Design a protein with these regions (language model features):
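TPR-adjacent "capping" and linker segments in tetratricopeptide-repeat scaffold/adaptor proteins
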Residues: 1-9, 112-114
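Structural signature of tandem alpha-helical TPR/SEL1-like repeats
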Residues: 8, 13, 19-29, 54-66, ...
């Protein structure tokens, strides 16, 4: 997916902020990326990770759900969503997401939920 220059620059800046531990700035920039480009899988996944690192678990879960909606056969997205659920204490949901990641690791596919 070709990113518009503004989104590409924002995403790079957000990655730099995340690397420096500037989580609030990273979250704001990732959020802006997905506002500008709602189908940007990497933006949603990165937003979820930054939200988790910030301790905002419900927000991380929402971003993670959006990522797996966009790419339901991405093993890392399901693994991340499972982690977000664990951090939020939602063990049943974490296990369900973890199973989907495991299925993908075995070469299976996950049906896109309607």
């Amino acid at each position: 997916m070709d990113l518009p220059p503004e989104v590409d620059e924002l995403f790079d800046d957000a990655n730099g902020d995340l690397a420096l531990g500037e989580l609030d700035q990273a979250v704001a920039k990732y959020r802006r990326c997905v506002e500008l480009m709602p189908e940007f899988f990497d933006g949603w996944h990165a937003l979820g990770m930054a939200q988790m690192k910030s301790g905002h678990f419900p927000e991380a879960i929402e971003a993670g759900k959006r990522a797996v909606e966009l790419q339901p056969n991405d093993q890392l997205a399901w693994s991340s969503l499972s982690l977000f659920y664990v951090r939020d204490g939602q063990i049943k949901e974490a296990e369900a997401a973890g199973v989907k990641a495991k299925i993908l690791s075995w070469g299976g596919k996950v049906k896109k939920e309607e």
